[in-house]
């Protein structure tokens, strides 16, 4: 799909930042309007992250206009908002391929463009990486500048504050731009603050400020008085105290949709020494009324008709696993007031909207703080409550030490509802749930369950919730299989289920690839086992299958290395059972983006691929 660039005459003149910087500043508002419309048209035809990009159009234009990218380093935290950046950095004609197999990466990606200096996807990493680049630039001595753009959600994470504390301590030259799009820090936006921001970022103010510090450095009482006076004056109109205490010079807030003010402020700040923080106020979804009204709903969108102002409903009548979890959560809370649900800023994605409204006293959104979420849950468990941590597989990686040190070592009854296990699709390498079975399986005291359908998912959630120790239920992104939902009951811990009896080959399946493995088993006349438990492994059943069959095949949507299949290998070797085993799962690579079914087919994890791998191995 390509758009007629003639409909965007100003944007047509800015194929890359070098061309952008040749435009007169008077044309920048027109460029922003066209860029926003181009983004709307592209995403509506191809799907993708939407509202975040609309909110940073003016900022993106101003940054590339003022800074000498790619020589100067521009870092986008998370990367949802980087579509305008990609459009302006030579990728305009390919933007419609974003998040698709073999298309543009969903986030800034080092291998894709020299303008993407940091590969991202997870939040709150930009300031740490930016500080490292700033230190390297100082050692390089070529005047390279470093700019980090971070949102008001991502900046709440501990890692961001750790980085700012370090930056303030070593006084490196860098600019952090706080993109505040939810009015959560300050509402002081207007002409006075825009004027003040330009004044405070100007060379005269900076020279007076630094000169005053030097002149009175030998007179502590006067120096302290000047500092208090400055903070008092700034504090009247800006929330600077926190960032100043961390060692940053605070400028703002600035209207993030006034491209001329942004450009002038950035020019003023470009050569300032030490760590600087520019606070801008933006509207997520800016320029498209439905997205402005519901920025969460329009965060990531399928193809849609811009004229209708509505998103198409899912064509599947089957509930998602996230919804299955959310319904179970409400069902359980209705019977047990001890249930406490914890999520690190993933309420919508984890299916917890209904629960948060119906049981607000039992619901905790701890923001982007995965480490805190897990240890907070440990504290709830110690206090006699029954915490359920709803978290994506890829984000649980960020709390691995807490999982071990604060939960598992103490054998605390915390249930982990791990969403997005396995291949997640369009978000690519940074979001695949490829490693959770591997990194959890080695932790003592853990019970790890992998359901084959939505009914098993419910039963496992119930089992894990009532288990007196740490437990994890790991389920995929996507819809269920129309399985009949049976009454909830405790599953016997560490026991699998024989689904089909065959000959010679026994397929041991962990998780929702069971339906694909079933088709392969029927074509191969193989035995099929729904293993259910990754840990503790059903050793008796595995050894029985080894005794009755010539070969074993393990199937899982997790990294082969260290995964469930590795557990089968370890058991057989420990018991001296010399049975050949084929492990089928995710290979030793970071799986790129693509539709889930596309990637399963490419990796040999659909029915045909499983059968093909087995036949090739036996040949």
Swiss-Prot record:
**Top-rank taxon, per record:** Bacteria
* Family matches, as SUPFAM superfamilies: Thiamin diphosphate-binding fold (THDP-binding) (SSF52518), TK C-terminal domain-like (SSF52922)
What is the required cofactor set for this protein? Mg(2+); thiamine diphosphate
What is this enzyme's class at the first EC digit? transferase
Swiss-Prot/TrEMBL GO biological process terms? 1-deoxy-D-xylulose 5-phosphate biosynthetic process; isopentenyl diphosphate biosynthetic process, methylerythritol 4-phosphate pathway; terpenoid biosynthetic process; thiamine biosynthetic process
**Which GO terms fall under molecular function for this chain's record?**
1-deoxy-D-xylulose-5-phosphate synthase activity; magnesium ion binding; thiamine pyrophosphate binding
Q: Does the keyword Magnesium apply?
A: yes
Q: Which SMART domains match?
A: Transket_pyr
Reactions this protein catalyses: D-glyceraldehyde 3-phosphate + pyruvate + H(+) = 1-deoxy-D-xylulose 5-phosphate + CO2
Residues that, per the record, bind thiamine diphosphate: 80, 121-123, 153-154, 181, 288, 370
- Translocase as a keyword of this entry, yes or no, is no
Question: By its UniProt entry, which InterPro entries does this protein fall under?
Answer: Dxylulose-5-P_synthase, THDP-binding, Transketo_C/PFOR_II, Transketolase-like_Pyr-bd, Transketolase_BS, Transketolase_C, Transketolase_CS
Record: residues binding Mg(2+): 152, 181
Q: Which Pfam families match?
A: DXP_synthase_N, Transket_pyr, Transketolase_C
Q: Among the entry's GO cellular component annotations, what is one?
A: cytosol
Tell me the route in metabolism or biology where this protein functions. Metabolic intermediate biosynthesis; 1-deoxy-D-xylulose 5-phosphate biosynthesis; 1-deoxy-D-xylulose 5-phosphate from D-glyceraldehyde 3-phosphate and pyruvate: step 1/1
> What does the record's cofactor remark say about binding?
Binds 1 Mg(2+) ion per subunit. Binds 1 thiamine pyrophosphate per subunit.
Instruction: Family membership, please give it.
Output: Belongs to the transketolase family. DXPS subfamily.
Family annotation (HAMAP family): DXP_synth (MF_00315)
The subunit structure is: Homodimer.
Quote the protein name from its UniProt record: 1-deoxy-D-xylulose-5-phosphate synthase
Tell me the gene name: dxs
